[in-house]
Amino acid sequence: MATLGVNIDHIANVRQARKTVEPDPVQFAFLAELGGADSITVHLREDRRHIQDRDVFLLKETIKTKLNLEMAATEEMLEIAKKTLPDYVTLVPEKREEVTTEGGLDLKSNAQYLKNFVENLKHSNIEVSAFIDPLGEQINYSKEIGFDFIELHTGKYAELSGSEQYKELQRIIESTHLANDLGLVVNAGHGLNYNNVKKIASINNMNELNIGHSIVARALAIGLEKSVREMKSLITSN
């Protein structure tokens, strides 16, 4: 049965819109855990557009579940991860001009650099995941580089409908099976919401789904704890 990782970046987005101290994502992480979140995900971007360094450190000290730190593979982020010691790190591509992460890492073109980067994190006993598109080549490189997990990018699945969405779902299923055969733990995320999550959650050996925007959007209407409970129920009711 898949677990639920709640991404709280959008709480920080609201705070940073006014450059003030509220809403505090650390407080909302606590509410997400009350609602059943199995882990908390934050993306510390190089431009600090939402999550700030203090958020990461405070979350590590206060949350009761696990902390998943999404970050680019840079020396600055490596040092922050080694100081913070999150439960695991998910390496993601990053462009300053993007609104949100647009696609998976290209592991092939950065294989040696990423291998050294992953080894460095593992020396600090941090497990490492790669955010990748559901492609066989990228999954094979994930194993070769030494990642413990992969997170399959579900953005395309979320954007499509009908037969095209079905084809993308099959690609995600096949990618999950390939990764499992290679000994990789499989997470998934991006664009998942209350209407499309169940088919992804029902994939055999899917470990965790990382979801943020749809939960936060629904929380504006019904409250965060309840919105997390509803998503958790959808994931676990297979």
Swiss-Prot record:
Q: What is its main location?
A: cytoplasm
| Pathway in which this enzyme or protein is active | Cofactor biosynthesis; pyridoxine 5'-phosphate biosynthesis; pyridoxine 5'-phosphate from D-erythrose 4-phosphate: step 5/5
Catalysed transformations (reactions): 3-amino-2-oxopropyl phosphate + 1-deoxy-D-xylulose 5-phosphate = pyridoxine 5'-phosphate + phosphate + 2 H2O + H(+)
Record key words, sorted:
Cytoplasm, Pyridoxine biosynthesis, Transferase
Its GO biological process annotations read: pyridoxine biosynthetic process
Record's subunit section? Homooctamer; tetramer of dimers.
Q: Which family does it belong to?
A: Belongs to the PNP synthase family.
Record's protein name: Pyridoxine 5'-phosphate synthase
This protein's encoding gene: pdxJ
